[in-house]
């Protein structure tokens, strides 16, 4: 994944002071503040990163005699950089402006404070450069947890999601879930075209926020638990104690997985709701229901 300089300019509302080379792409979300480089130190210089000049670097350059400033800036421009951004609406020094034109480098300006701009551009690049995949399923926010419901086509994922929405939970995505890995966290969202829509077989597509209100949908959600729905298979040894530790890898990130068998008479939505509540409980509790039962058995045995 790569992001063009033109995309950054458009999405971050940057002013172009000097237009650089066409076709420059960014593959890193990190930034570099070139204060050390202006001081003459070039070891470990991240020249492949976006260069951000804040008030500190700008003031340092301003304090230099003109001949020293030109020498330092010219040495800095010997290294290829994707773009230079002046934060806080700062006015570029003449030497910086002249070298940007001479070396055909992008020189941009942001009105935002330096720290805020850095956070903004890093979040933007993290999102755009994050590894991504699309999974067939339904993503629902239940008790603040992102529950990804998967399973065979026609198993009842969307119908289950509809029941969960009626119970006050929120839909993130139906049918197709776009998932990105950002700093080892999986974030799921709906493709733009199907955002807020839910397909129910025999009924068609329904507009969830139109029927249930804007609070019934969410734009994106971290994925905490995967629940796989399958038809009940006789003879299969399903987990009855909650001790199975099954995981699935999405974008090489392990996620807790539960397999939920479906058969007539089971209220799947209620079971998933309980599974989410139990998962949240287990995150904070050191004592599982199995431990409690074992303790009671031990107490009963000692009493006898």
UniProtKB/Swiss-Prot annotation:
Binding site for Mg(2+): 158, 199
Pfam families for this protein: Hpr_kinase_C, Hpr_kinase_N
Region of interest (Important for the catalytic mechanism of both phosphorylation and dephosphorylation), ranges: 198-207
Active site residues per record: 136, 157, 175 (proton acceptor), 240
Enzyme class, broadest EC rank: transferase
GO molecular function: ATP binding; magnesium ion binding; phosphorelay sensor kinase activity; protein serine/threonine kinase activity; protein serine/threonine/tyrosine kinase activity
Signal peptide bounds: none
Residues noted as binding ATP in the record, renumbered to the chain: 151-158
Keyword Magnesium on entry: yes
GO BP, sorted A to Z: regulation of carbohydrate metabolic process
InterPro entries per the UniProt record, alphabetical: HPr(Ser)_kin/Pase, Hpr_kin/Pase_C, Hpr_kin/Pase_Hpr_N, P-loop_NTPase, Ser_kin/Pase_Hpr-like_N_sf
Alphabetical keyword list: ATP-binding, Carbohydrate metabolism, Kinase, Magnesium, Metal-binding, Multifunctional enzyme, Nucleotide-binding, Serine/threonine-protein kinase, Transferase
Reactions it catalyzes: [HPr protein]-L-serine + ATP = [HPr protein]-O-phospho-L-serine + ADP + H(+); [HPr protein]-O-phospho-L-serine + phosphate + H(+) = [HPr protein]-L-serine + diphosphate
Highest taxon above the source species: Bacteria
Family: Belongs to the HPrK/P family.
Subunit structure: Homohexamer.
Other facts: Both phosphorylation and phosphorolysis are carried out by the same active site and suggest a common mechanism for both reactions.
Name of the featured protein: HPr kinase/phosphorylase
């Amino acid at each position: 994944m790569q992001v063009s300089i033109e995309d950054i300019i458009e999405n971050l509302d940057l002013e172009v002071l000097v237009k650089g080379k066409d076709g420059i792409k960014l593959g890193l979300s990190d930034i570099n503040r070139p204060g050390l480089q202006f001081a003459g130190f070039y070891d470990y210089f991240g020249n492949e990163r976006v260069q951000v000049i804040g008030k500190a670097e700008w003031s340092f350059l301003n304090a230099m005699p003109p001949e020293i400033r030109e020498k330092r800036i010219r040495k800095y421009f010997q290294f290829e950089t994707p773009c230079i951004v002046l934060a806080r609406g700062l006015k570029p020094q003449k030497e910086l402006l002249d070298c940007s034109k001479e070396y055909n480098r992008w020189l941009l300006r942001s009105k935002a404070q330096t720290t805020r701009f850095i956070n903004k551009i890093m979040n933007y690049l993290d999102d755009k450069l994050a590894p991504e995949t699309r999974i067939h399923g339904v993503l629902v926010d239940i008790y603040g947890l992102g529950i990804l419901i998967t399973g065979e086509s026609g198993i009842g994922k969307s119908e289950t999601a509809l029941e969960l929405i009626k119970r006050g939970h929120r839909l993130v995505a139906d049918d197709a879930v776009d998932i990105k890995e950002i700093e080892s966290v999986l974030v799921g969202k709906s493709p733009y075209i199907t955002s807020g829509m839910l397909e129910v077989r025999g009924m068609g597509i329904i507009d969830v926020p139109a029927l249930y209100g804007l609070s019934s949908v969410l734009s994106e959600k971290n994925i905490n638990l995967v629940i796989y729905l399958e038809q009940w298979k006789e003879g299969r040894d399903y987990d009855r104690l909650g001790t199975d530790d099954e995981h699935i890898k999405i974008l090489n990130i392990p996620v807790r997985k539960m397999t939920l068998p479906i058969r007539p008479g089971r209220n799947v939505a209620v079971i998933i709701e309980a599974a989410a509540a139990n998962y949240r409980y287990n995150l904070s509790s050191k004592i599982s229901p199995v431990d409690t039962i074992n303790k009671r058995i031990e107490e009963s045995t000692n009493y006898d």
